[in-house]
Amino acid sequence: MASVGPVKTKTVTLKELTPPIPSPEKSACKGAKPDSNHMALVPVKPSQPGSGKLITRTRLQRDSLISQQQRDALVVSSFGIGTTRHGQPDNTTSSIKDGFSTAAGGVNCASVVVAQSEKDSVRFHLCVDALAEGCVNTFIHLFHLSHRDPVCVDQLAQTLFTIPDEKLVWVKSQLAAVEVLRRQSEFRDVCERCQLLADYFESERDCDEAAWHYDVALRIAMESLDRPLEQEVRLSFGAFFERHKQLRKAIALFEEVYHLAMALNDVETAVEANYRLIRTYLSLSAELKDTNPKEAISFLERALDMSQRVKSSKDEADSLHALGNIYESMGDFRRALEYQKRFFEVARAANLVEREKRASLCVASMQERMNMTDEAVHSLQCALELSEKAADIEGVYRATMQLGQAYDSSGDHEKALMSYRANFGAARKLNNSDLTDQARVALGFALGEHYLKHAGGGRGYVPIVCDDVKAQLEWMSNGIL
């Protein structure tokens, strides 16, 4: 049996048993071969309860709608950085050049920050004072008035209107008084303040703003249930539109006044509304007579009806005269003559001398155009008598001129010559060169016609020139032919 020799033992440490972990640099090197003598240790994943797989959740990264620079701008505008009341504004927002964009559009940062010059202005302090007093409506309207663009009040002269600072203080006080008095139910005082504001803006020719204050007064008067106050405001509002030639709006307001007055049995207000309606109807018909004569006739008929209702002879005569003129311009001479005759009758019955003279001339003109010569002569003689009684030289001039033309049309040249002589004398008394020249020409033609047929005791001008030398010499020496 062989003997066993002594066994050799070697002590091995834990460090020697652990294989070296290759570094990332060495493993990433190109051409590096793994060491076959080393065993790679693979990390073991922790087990998940109920599942053998590891579920990983990734958080979605959303892009911000605004940049950090724009976010800073929002912070600046929200907290009022750079808008200190005292001292110079700080430069916190000086680095922000661009505005920030929102869903509503782009906003410039500079427009959000209030400038120091604006905070030192009168309009800024007035708006703040109105808001501090609790007058929110005053603040809103005053802000609009003080920050609006200059208003063009004259298109031809390009005149612009802006409320001066000293007047803006007064406007603010009136607006605040309107709001406070309305809360106290002092409705008449409110309307008086609105009237003052409307008068001021109308004097500056800012008619839109003046109309706005009239409208406010009317709405407050209607809320008050004070019918007399409501009627007064409507009449003032209508008169404003009448002054500025917005006649249809004026008519609408005056008609409301009339119907309400009739419902309340307020005779005095109804009569006042009637007179204003008549005047407005006549003015509007004068504007429409060339462009829309049928509509003008409808307004004149309404004016005629109202004038007869209130028994106003002057307005009735004017309505009839205007109707006659429109029908004459339309070529309806029969109806024109009918209305002019009614015009003459109303004027004579009411002893309206001026209108009676004018009516006589109008009737005669229509009769002459319709070849009613005898009737025209009669009407003209009536007009001449009225003018002579009233010592109206201009009326005498017109009557004698038309009378001479009427006599010429009828073939009575002797009476025509007499009328033209009277016409020339009246023209010289008027000291009007144009009328004098016109009368001289008419008289010259009349004298020529007369001498052509009646010169030399009825022989005529042509036989005298051809045969009677003695008569020619007498004419040349004495001026008598």
Swiss-Prot record:
Disruption phenotype: Defects in flagellar motility and cell mobility. Gene3D superfamilies: Tetratricopeptide repeat domain. Keywords: Cell projection, Cilium, Cytoplasm, Cytoskeleton, Flagellum, Repeat, TPR repeat. It is found in: Cytoplasm, Cytoskeleton, Flagellum axoneme. The keyword Zinc does not apply. Its main location: cytoplasm. The TPR repeats are required for axonemal localization and flagellar beating. Interacts with TAX-1. This is Tetratricopeptide repeat protein 29. It comes from Trypanosoma brucei brucei (strain 927/4 GUTat10.1).
